[in-house]
From Swiss-Prot:
Name by which UniProt lists this protein: SLA class II histocompatibility antigen, DQ haplotype D beta chain
Organism: Sus scrofa
A Pfam family annotated for this UniProt entry: C1-set
Any Gene Ontology biological process: antigen processing and presentation of exogenous peptide antigen via MHC class II
Membrane topology: Single-pass type I membrane protein
Region Beta-2, residue ranges: 124-217
InterPro entries for this protein: Ig-like_dom, Ig-like_dom_sf, Ig-like_fold, Ig/MHC_CS, Ig_C1-set, MHC/Immunoglobulin, MHC_I/II-like_Ag-recog, MHC_II_a/b_N
Ranges in the topological domain labelled Extracellular: 32-227
Keyword Glycoprotein among UniProt keywords: yes
Keywords: Adaptive immunity, Disulfide bond, Glycoprotein, Immunity, Membrane, MHC II, Signal, Transmembrane, Transmembrane helix
Cytoplasmic side: 249-258
Disulfide links within the chain: 44-108, 146-202
Amino acid sequence: MVALRLPRGLWTAALTVMLVVLGAPVAEGRDSPQDFVVQFKGECYFYNGTQRVWSVDRYIYNQEEFLRFDSDMGEYRAVTPLGRPDADYLNGQKEALEQKRAELDTVCKHNYQIEEGTTLQRRVQPTVTISPSKAEALNHHNLLVCAVTDFYPSQVKVQWFRNGQEETAGVVSTPLIRNGDWTYQVLVMLEMNLQRGDVYTCRVEHSSLQSPILVEWRAQSESAQSKMLSGVGGFVLGLIFLGLGLFIRHRSQKGLVR
């Protein structure tokens, strides 16, 4: 299903409703509020392209919807008592009512054709990374985090596998996060007990991909970690001695020049 909010349509009716609403508290003998907000929202919903189209117009006063036009109903319906006079009036305007019903084609389907080549077909491939939540330790509980970032549209499927077998227990996902630039991200975490030789795979399916993304993460043994740390330490120590040697040589050359 695709939903588009399209602020186009029968603005004359919307303006009429707003004017009636603004005068309603006085007509009913109530004091007018100091601050008020009147909103109009036009929404179009699409199923399987334009095979099934449904539209809803919502009229809102101070954050409360009071009147609605539903294309399936074909008429205005009051949501609260405040909307009854407006519904009666607008349903009595036969020509305007027929125009409102026609907006399913003139507005919703029309705008779908405009947006189809840009917004509705826009695809951005996700970036997938795996990282443990804390330092690796064999035979200890840990949390692997599969970060799926910067993708569009929002529908995405993320699965965890351990040695080729899907893991469903201990899988937790964050809600879908909007990045604010028409892309999304989600974190899917797997609680596991780290064992030597285990291979974990995060599998991501998305409409922008011709085939799923598979990212692997392998548990390192303690000896492998020690060797890696020793190698890193040796490399850093070598850089220190190299820098010291270059410094001494530079000082010696300056002394000879003098």
